[in-house]
Amino acid sequence: MKYIVLLAFVAACSCSAKHGDPGEGSGSVTQVTDPADAIDQKLMIALSQAKNFHHKAKVYMSDGNTAAAIASVREILAIRFPPAPEADDVRNDARALLARLLVGQGQLDEAMNVVKEGLSSPRESFFVANLYTVKGEIHEARAQQLEAQDPTAKAKLVEEHHAAIEAFDQSNRIDKKLQDQLMENR
């Protein structure tokens, strides 16, 4: 019994001991949030609403009800967010999903307009990079649509393919830049 208690004590101590450099973030599990990093209640409420609309959209998508899914995603874009980077990220994530849903419905021009709204964002992020990926997918869909409707329109087909490649490359450039920044800050 004495050995079991001793073993439990050693295990508990080893789990709570600090390992590595103190700068590696391996300190206490519980840390007080810096007030500058805290998210205010208005933003939390808006993020909660967005999460719920996103879940509704996923349920509608699983039921095959694309129109209702599109409506739910549009609700995310209608939420009044306080100014914050998280708000931009949520909107851009919703724009990417909305654009993909619209592509699935053959509404390519509307999908491109939704993507362009998000690409006007001055802050580069994963979500902006994802919008460039979706932009490339829209160009691919346009090329497929064009090929089905007018196989003789080779110049326009090549133009759409190149636009898709440019969009994918821009997405990769943003992701690489963000990744390099993260590696520098390690």
Language model regions located:
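Flexible helix-coil transition and linker loops at the boundaries of alpha-helical arrays
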Residues: 38-44, 78-91, 119-129, 175-184
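Alpha-helical segment of the N-proximal tetratricopeptide repeat
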Residues: 43-79
